[in-house]
Structure formats: C-alpha cells, structure tokens
Amino acid sequence: MSSTMFVKRNPIRETTAGKISSPSSPTLNVAVAHIRAGSYYEIDASILPQRSPENLKSIRVVMVSKITASDVSLRYPSMFSLRSHFDYSRMNRNKPMKKRSGGGLLPVFDESHVMASELAGDLLYRRIAPHELSMNRNSWGFWVSSSSRRNKFPRREVVSQPAYNTRLCRAASPEGKCSSELKSGGMIKWGRRLRVQYQSRHIDTRKNKEGEESSRVKDEVYKEEEMEKEEDDDDGNEIGGTKQEAKEITNGNRKRKLIESSTERLAQKAKVYDQKKETQIVVYKRKSERKFIDRWSVERYKLAERNMLKVMKEKNAVFGNSILRPELRSEARKLIGDTGLLDHLLKHMAGKVAPGGQDRFMRKHNADGAMEYWLESSDLIHIRKEAGVKDPYWTPPPGWKLGDNPSQDPVCAGEIRDIREELASLKRELKKLASKKEEEELVIMTTPNSCVTSQNDNLMTPAKEIYADLLKKKYKIEDQLVIIGETLRKMEEDMGWLKKTVDENYPKKPDSTETPLLLEDSPPIQTLEGEVKVVNKGNQITESPQNREKGRKHDQQERSPLSLISNTGFRICRPVGMFAWPQLPALAAATDTNASSPSHRQAYPSPFPVKPLAAKRPLGLTFPFTIIPEEAPKNLFNV
C-alpha cells in the first residue's frame, strides 16, 4: 500500500520541484521532494556532521534558499543578528508598528550553508507554517535550539512519510548505504575521545596468572589426548583388519575411557587450583591517606611551625622583647618558601602550642597599632587560671610564686614572706626550748641529785649554746623593731611639729615691719609690747629679767607637748640659712664661719619667715632672712 502511495505522490513532488531546478536523477528528487525553496524548516541538530558550523548547531529554524540536484542551500540568522533583533524589539516594544523606524519583523538571515540533498532530507524534518512563524518570531526559544524545546514537537511522527522516502532512496542509491552513513556523520572521526577503563596492576597480574595456569592445564590435557590417540593408532595397526567389529568395540571403549579419564583429571586439577587459590594470600600495597591541615599536608605544616619556632628563638622573642610582624616575616621567608603558608601561620598560630610542647606562640597589637609576636611557657595559661588573672597577656614578675597577690609588688611580697618565715621559725624554736626546759625540770624533779648533776653537764652545754644564739637573734630583731618604731614616731612628731609651726608663724599682717636680728654684739631689740631682748654672741636670744616671770606663766599655758618633749640638752639657736633641726657639730661649724666672715653679717629678707619654738617661751619676733651657706645641711629633718 505504501509503495502505491509513493508512486502516486511522486509526480506531484516532481512537478513542484521542477519549477525551481531540473533534477538529474530520480532518487535525489525523491530525497528532497518534500523540501520547498523559500520555506522555513525546523532542523534536527543531532544529525549534523562534525564539520558543520557552530552557529548552525545552535539554530533551530532555517530557510531553504536554493535546491539543486546534488545539494541544498540554507540561510539562517547568526547569534549577533538574533541579539540585535531582540534588543531592538525590546527597546521599541511600546511604539506602534507604523512608527517604528529601522529593524524588521524577522531577524536578518546573514549566514548560509550548503549541504548534500540526502543529508538535507533528514535534517529538514518539519516545515514551519507562516502563521506559526508570525506568532513566535519574538521568542528566543523559537530561533535557538534547546533540548526542552525540541522535545515539544513530535519529529518522527510528523515526518514519517518523508523519512521513509529518504530511506527508500538511500536503498536504491548506487553509492549504497555506507557512503550515506559516512556523510551523515555516523562514524567516529579524529578528535573524539574514547572511554578507557583502567584497572590496577594487581588485578591485571592476577588475571594474567589465571590465564597462564588455565592455558597450561589445557596444553597438558591436549598433549595427553594426542599421546593416547597415537597409542590407539599403533594398537590398531598391530591388530590388523580381520577383527574389525572387535576393533570398533575396543576403540569405542577406549574413547569412552579417555574422555572419562580426561574429565576426571581436569576436575582434579581444577580442585587443586581452587584450593591453591583459596590458600593464597595476596598482599596489596595501599597508599596511606594523606592528612591535610587546611590546604597543606600535615608534614609541610609541622615543618613550617618548626621553622617559625627556630626563627623566634634565634631572635629571643620573649615577653618584653617581642618581634614585629614585618621583621619576623622577612626572617621566616628564608626558611618557608610558601608565602601563603607563611601568612596563614602568622595569622592563625596565636595561642597554639609550638612543636615540642614547651612554648606557645603569642601575638597582640602594641600601643602603636603594630602586630608583635613572642614566645611564652605553655603552662602559663594554667598558672593564670589558678591565680585568677583574666588578662590573657599577664606574665608573672620575677620572684612571684603561686599564692601571692598578682597586683602586689613581688619584692615587697618576698620580703614580707621572708619575715613571716623567720618569725615562724623563731616561734617554733622558742616552743622547742620551752618544751625542753619543762622536760629538764621534770627530770630534775624525778631524778636524784647525783644523776641530775651528771645529766646537766651533758645536756646543758648544747642547750645553752642554742639558747644563747636564739637570744642574740631575738635581741637583734627587737633592736631593729625598736629603731624602726622610733624612726616612725620621730617622723610623725616632726611632721606634726612642722605643720603646727607653719600654721602659727605664717605672716597674717603683710604691712607689719619686722627688724632683722643681728649676728654679734647687737643692741637690745624693742618689741611691740615693750619687751627688751638681747642677742648674745653665741647666736642665742635671751630675755630681760623683768619679763621672765611673765614668760614662765605664759609658758605654762601655751607650751605644747612637743616643746615639753624636746626639753633636752639641745638649745634652739638662730637658724643658719634654712630652718633645720639643730645639730651641734654642723651648727658650731656654721656659726664659726658666719662669725669669721664679715660678709655674712648682713641680713637678707626671707619670703617665708618662720618663728621657731623656744625652749622656755615662744618668741614674738620672726626672722626674715634666707642665708643658705654651702656647708649647711640640706635635709629638713636629721634624726
């Protein structure tokens, strides 16, 4: 039925195709009979040969421009033409069709390709109607091929008849089927990669051994069969031809026996081979899995850490002598060639234990904002936790022990600790001595006089020595404590006296005029109250006998406890230069020098007048002078 239909439809296709070009052979006309020039067709890019243009492989719709007897010319838009077409349509989407300037309804078919008519018969498998073209002309998927887009159209169902016709033409073609298959690109050509299955060496060697053993077994069986056949032939020749029936029977029995024996031998050899195979132990060398830290191997990472530790130890980078990052990087660059690994270590090694487990890498920003690195003990983090220090960079000062206050000065803490230990040892020794003394008293009470005298001679000598040493130590410590207490008490008294003196003698009347004292042979000084006072040659101020009774009463009322305490053999003298606590040697030397030199007899006004407290009665006059000789002491208090 199909052949009759083919014969009836052929004249119509020949007439339509004859208007364009005159066919040279009926078989080629049948191959391109369903193709019309000027029409648009959808192509099957999967059957394109390898030498076809790349743009044609990505295009879905082409136009037939010319049909000849041997080939078909196609025109199709390039990707640049499609992009320009869609860009222009997107820009002028809101304009009416009449007002649009430039551009067209369809993209420009600026590419062309010529192919064989046999290939075109299969490639152009569906004709696109004009109304479908007008509806889908602004769709990108309509022009560009895609697997999802091609699956929507049933290709082979629509073109079953033309494809059948092309197959008939290929069958009737004088070139044969092979040439058409070669032209259609069915053969693998240069540039194609073939899949190769790789097997490891131990599998290949095992297969080779198995093949060699099986071939050896087969060769042995074959040789045995040949030997048996030769023996059978020799036996047959010797017997002769008189007994042919008996010979045939014997030959049949022999063949049966040979077959049975050969099968038994093969089975035995197979069993032995299987047993050997079961007992065989195959050892494979498996490569150990390489472990990585980030993107570097463990060996390489550990080597870089060791080199970094070596550089920091050479530079003595410890707490207080840290090394800056640029200097450390330049030195470590000589040993660590991978700069990426070097920068990674500089960034992430802070807080990690160095190789060896004794040191720890540390880093922080200094006051200038630069990064600095140093090494510290790996146990220091546990010491901080036990001491209760929250500062991650705290380092114990020298002399610090676990249990001391972290905020206290270690020198003071050490001295206080030593004093406490000495006092504790003294207390223990005193307790021992007291206990020994009690024991000795008990022994004296319990033993007779003769025994006591003999025992005392033996026991008292070392005890007396120990007791004497302890008493010496005790006296020394007590003397030191007494000296310290007296010094502190004198300092407190001097400070109170100085404060009281400044408060009492600070000038409240700046307009008052005071006359300076004279050094030697001065006339009597008349005070505001009419009291007369005389300056002796020894730089001492004395009062007239008329005012002594008044002074005594006034002294009893106004004399301070400090003046009572200071009522000693020392006398309050006129200060030389600066007011100081009197010292007899220094004061005598200063007095002699002042008395001998006439230049010192002139008095100078003092900006801070001080009125000293006398032993008997406080004077009402101030001494405004500031003579500071070089020999005078500089300290305010000389205890």
UniProtKB/Swiss-Prot annotation:
Disordered, as annotated region: 201-256, 536-561
Entry keyword set: Developmental protein, Meiosis, Nucleus
Biased composition (Basic and acidic residues): 201-226, 546-558
UniProt-annotated location(s): Nucleus
Tissue expression remark: Meiocytes (at protein level).
Function field: Required for fertility. Involved in chromatid cohesion establishment, in chromosome structure during male and female meiosis (e.g. the synapse formation between homologous chromosomes, the recombination, and the cohesion of both chromatid arm and centromere), and in axial element formation. Regulates the switch from mitosis to the reductional meiosis division of megaspores prior to the female gametogenesis (megasporogenesis).
Name of the protein in question: Protein DYAD
GO CC term (a single one): nucleus
Gene Ontology biological process: female meiosis sister chromatid cohesion; male meiosis sister chromatid cohesion; reciprocal meiotic recombination
Gene this chain is encoded by: DYAD
Residues annotated as transmembrane: none
Main location: nucleus
Phenotype upon gene inactivation: Plants contain 2 cells with prominent nuclei in the central region of the ovule where the embryo sac is normally located. Sometimes, an unreduced diploid female gamete, arising from apomeiosis, can be fertilized by a haploid male gamete, leading to a viable triploid embryo.
UniProt feature, compositional bias: Acidic residues: 227-237
